[in-house]
């Protein structure tokens, strides 16, 4: 993952994630192969902020059936990024 935009897939906008935005915590869906250091570097490069810590969660795919064929949905990884107190707010989430 040479590019920072390959690490960060999309923001996660849920009721809980919007509540913790006041504490400078932002939630993103990230590549499943990315580690915390790569996620931190990608956020700092894209948004030009300082990251205090990164918490990650791995989700397994859910079993799904289509007729007699069974399979799984894609697995995913979610990261909650906490910014330092002196960092600016991410304007990406304004109006949410």
Swiss-Prot record:
PROSITE patterns (alphabetical): RIBOSOMAL_L23 (PS00050)
Described function: One of the early assembly proteins it binds 23S rRNA. One of the proteins that surrounds the polypeptide exit tunnel on the outside of the ribosome. Forms the main docking site for trigger factor binding to the ribosome.
Homology family: Belongs to the universal ribosomal protein uL23 family.
Entries under Gene3D superfamilies matching the protein: 3.30.70.330
InterPro entries xrefs: Nucleotide-bd_a/b_plait_sf (IPR012677), Ribosomal_uL23-like (IPR013025), Ribosomal_uL23/eL15/eS24_sf (IPR012678), Ribosomal_uL23_CS (IPR001014)
Record GO biological process: translation
Organism: Halalkalibacterium halodurans (strain ATCC BAA-125 / DSM 18197 / FERM 7344 / JCM 9153 / C-125) (Bacillus halodurans)
Protein name, as recorded: Large ribosomal subunit protein uL23
Keywords attached to this entry: Ribonucleoprotein, Ribosomal protein, RNA-binding, rRNA-binding
Pfam family, one: Ribosomal_L23
Subunit structure: Part of the 50S ribosomal subunit. Contacts protein L29, and trigger factor when it is bound to the ribosome.
GO cellular component labels: ribonucleoprotein complex; ribosome
UniProt cross-references to PANTHER family, sorted A to Z: 60S RIBOSOMAL PROTEIN L23A
An annotated Gene Ontology molecular function: structural constituent of ribosome
């Amino acid at each position: 993952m040479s590019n920072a935009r390959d690490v960060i897939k999309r923001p996660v906008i849920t009721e809980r994630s919007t509540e913790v935005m006041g504490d400078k915590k932002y939630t993103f869906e990230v590549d499943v192969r990315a580690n915390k250091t790569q996620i931190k570097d990608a956020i700092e490069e894209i948004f030009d902020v300082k990251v205090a810590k990164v918490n990650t969660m791995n989700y397994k795919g859910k079993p799904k059936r289509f007729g007699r064929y069974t399979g799984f949905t894609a697995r995913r990884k979610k990261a909650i990024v906490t910014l330092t107190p002196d960092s600016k707010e991410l304007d990406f989430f304004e109006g949410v």
